[in-house]
Design a protein with these regions (language model features):
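P-loop NTP-binding core
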Residues: 2-179
């Protein structure tokens, strides 16, 4: 069999050489997509992962943000969330501390060229209670914290896909506010 085989990285290199790799103009905003439904078990995580993979295969630079403490999207990339990851590998420190100015610390390369993941694990659920308690004290700006985080990494990506939890909680509301 004399068929040539190419990796996605090689295809993206060829797209770069021939000028066919999709890109967004520097003044165009990053597309932020939320695959959201308030019911569980309807395929949100599967759809979010497949959308992110499809866009990466097409040559786009994609970030997938797993905002769900069930961590289904994270699991689909080969992680055992509560064994392989700590809370410091997720959105949790960014949402909780307010000390971090960017989500760069949480980005992880995947086996898809052009696709990076911000993973989740069960400890991310703690942020639901913490955000709700702090918002009850009058700090409604916390709902925009995730949007600020997405903006901090948006210059590196064409598309950001978010996989929120199946509930109408603080994280879900933050995801809605961050999506465009």
């Amino acid at each position: 069999n004399r068929r040539e085989r190419y990796t996605l990285a090689q295809l993206n290199d060829m797209r770069g050489v021939f000028g066919t790799r999709p890109y967004r103009a520097p003044n165009d905003p990053c597309c932020v997509v939320a695959v959201q439904n308030f019911k569980g078990g309807v395929g949100k995580s599967t759809l979010a992962v497949h959308l992110a993979q499809y866009l990466a295969i097409r040559g786009y630079r994609v970030a997938l943000v797993d905002c769900d403490s069930q961590a289904s999207a994270t699991t689909l990339f080969g992680y055992v969330p509560d064994l392989d990851l700590t809370e410091h590998d997720t959105l949790y420190p960014f949402l909780r501390e307010g000390e971090r100015s960017s989500l760069d610390y949480a980005l992880r390369k995947t086996h898809f060229d052009g696709l990076e993941l911000i993973p989740a694990n069960l400890r991310l659920f703690n942020s639901e209670y913490e955000l709700a308690a702090r918002m009850a004290q009058g700090n409604g700006a916390l709902l925009d914290r995730l949007k600020e985080g997405i903006e901090s990494i948006s210059d590196r990506f064409d598309v950001v896909v978010m996989d929120p939890p199946p509930a109408l909680g603080a994280i879900s509301l933050s995801v809605l506010r961050a999506a465009n």
